[in-house]
Amino acid sequence: MGFCSTSTLPQTSLSNSQSSTFFTYLKPCPILSSTYLRPKRLKFRLRISATATIDSPNGAVAVVEPEKQPEKISFGRQYFPLAAVIGQDAIKTALLLGAIDREIGGIAICGKRGTAKTLMARGLHAILPPIEVVVGSMANADPNCPDEWEDGLADRAEYGSDGNIKTQIVKSPFVQIPLGVTEDRLIGSVDVEESVKSGTTVFQPGLLAEAHRGVLYVDEINLLDEGISNLLLNVLTEGVNIVEREGISFRHPCKPLLIATYNPEEGAVREHLLDRIAINLSADLPMSFDDRVAAVDIATRFQECSNEVFKMVDEETDSAKTQIILAREYLKDVTISRDQLKYLVMEAIRGGCQGHRAELYAARVAKCLAAIDGREKVGVDELKKAVELVILPRSTIVENPPDQQNQQPPPPPPPPQNQDSSEEQNEEEEKEEEDQEDEKDRENEQQQPQVPDEFIFDAEGGLVDEKLLFFAQQAQRRKGKAGRAKKVIFSEDRGRYIKPMLPKGPVKRLAVDATLRAAAPYQKLRRAKDIQKTRKVYVEKTDMRAKRMARKAGALVIFVVDASGSMALNRMQNAKGAALKLLAESYTSRDQVCIIPFRGDAAEVLLPPSRSISMARNRLERLPCGGGSPLAHGLTTAVRVGMNAEKSGDVGRIMIVAITDGRANISLKRSTDPEAEASDAPRPSSQELKDEILEVAGKIYKTGMSLLVIDTENKFVSTGFAKEIARVAQGKYYYLPNASDAVISAATKDALSALKES
């Protein structure tokens, strides 16, 4: 638990209605963990009274209205205070860093249900200081940064009698992005009502404009539409939202603090999205028994009497608010040396981090940590903490740390020298004492090393500190993958409405909202042309907009089963059992199952793609077996069925499960051409049959389908050809000569889960 410094703030006073007095802080700050604040170098004056005013060095004065105490609010929802959260120190520290520097790069919190992810995000908003905005700004424009104002604000800004721009103090915005948000609501669109009234195109700001200089919260970002998430991060990376659509050309700043949360059990987040967020932390770290009891106790007390909990952490909350204000001023003067940058780069290299974002974000985090501590230079502790918060979750690490029994602990830092005896003289003036303390702090900072004695990662990329292993493993488990499989199917007739688009033919589903927005600016002109005034709204064909719909893409599992030979009946029974198990669990995932046995001279579709269990039972009641082994035709038939299903628009992922021993004796030509058997052409050799099958396997990979080969060949006569098929198709291979339906189902579900996460 950290404490704020007891040093007095110079040139800082608290003024009541009659008197002013200097103040000190000695309050526990559980939110800040082990950080300390030294506000004595502060270069601006903070005066707190009935209404607080902050006098900045440039002479601007912002009037801050006092916030209402929670106990005085008689309506509305009260959110759990951040200071009352038990544990989760790393996440709370990261949130405070984001409060100090909104452009730090964002914070992602991963965790299962009930780990206080949303609670902490909303708790941070309660301690954010208010902001000063230009009156009439739709994007919370900062009066001190006219270069970042939205288009047209300079012309419509209001000025007071003293010639200064009128400003107002508002609460820091907190905007949550719903999962079903459309592109229009996110980035902004045409204001239909105002456009109809004025006869010109009027821009209506979206959620991104509302969130500028505040908090932008995305719950379950892993479930957010892929196009929306890409658009969101692109705008946040650029820091400006540029809208070019429907006759609109508008731009406004967008620099909020991004806080994203998600549950990995409901789906992984794409790796490139996590890479663009600075701090990625897990809320699933284990809690001690006492901490869990304390968490239940404080939550129960909050439900019974929230005012009591607010009063209990009132001092800590006030200290955190002051900490944020002071650290924002310190951050302007914090510097980081070249040697310290080299240390961060080396840690990123040893951790196997891709790109340069890891060290860039880590340097910014280290400076924020130094600002919290009241330092003008980044120290050793700040570097270590930055590596833990930024680089460690991005690393590719060795699962087992090296043996540390023979490792010696790092030497302690040298003790401060040349202690000045003037500290014991209590009769000296306060200004001289502060000057001497500043001088002594500068000497200590010069004596302390600039970089840590040890790296967190060793030269091979393994963790040196085994205490961080669990934390790193949690970060690795939640990473997503990039692949070619489609998770969403777009169409114009079925699914969820995500955005309007210009029609490419007849309009199947009219986007009424977008159509009215496109027609709104021309209503006055069209009404003037209509002499009879027969309509209230004039819409022409060029205004028409179609809906772009999206729906969840299901998967198709095609079982290609070798129904030839003495073990054919067992293989067919196991494939039938595995198919029924998958269908029983595919209701929510929209997965389909198909069974194609191959025997005799050709393969046949015994069960076409279906989600119906009753249909599968009826179709699989009779299981044909015996005869030759046309493996090539079985795989070719599976590809044809998969491509037809993909064209239907219901399937986004296709996986072929081949249950075979890899021994084929029927060529593809014989299977497709009945007259080939009657001809005098020589039978193909065993090598020619293998080459033909490998060629089909290569085509499976080129079509984007996934192949899982379950080898049932006896190991004593095994040729290993089934494994070669999987290698050429770049699929998965399992050797299961006596596989049951449960084993086949488990292997299929494992491969299917990996395909869905890709």
From Swiss-Prot:
Entry EC number(s): 6.6.1.1
InterPro entries: AAA+_ATPase (IPR003593), BchD/ChlD_VWA (IPR041702), ChlI/MoxR_AAA_lid (IPR041628), Mg_chelatase_ATPase-dsu (IPR011776), Mg_chelatse_chII-like_cat_dom (IPR000523), P-loop_NTPase (IPR027417), VWF_A (IPR002035), vWFA_dom_sf (IPR036465)
Catalysis performed (reactions): protoporphyrin IX + Mg(2+) + ATP + H2O = Mg-protoporphyrin IX + ADP + phosphate + 3 H(+)
Top-level enzyme category: ligase
One GO CC term on file: chloroplast
Keyword Ligase on entry: yes
Transit peptide endpoints, chain numbering: 1-62
Database matches in CDD domains: AAA, vWA_Magnesium_chelatase
Region (Disordered): 395-453, 669-688
UniProt-annotated location(s): Plastid, Chloroplast
Taxonomy, superkingdom: Eukaryota
Compositionally biased region (Acidic residues): 421-438
Quaternary structure annotation from Swiss-Prot or TrEMBL: The magnesium chelatase complex is a heterotrimer consisting of subunits CHLI, CHLD and CHLH.
Matching NCBIfam families: BchD-ChlD
Name listed for the protein in its UniProt record: Magnesium-chelatase subunit ChlD, chloroplastic
Lineage, broadest ranks: Eukaryota, Viridiplantae, Streptophyta, Embryophyta, Tracheophyta
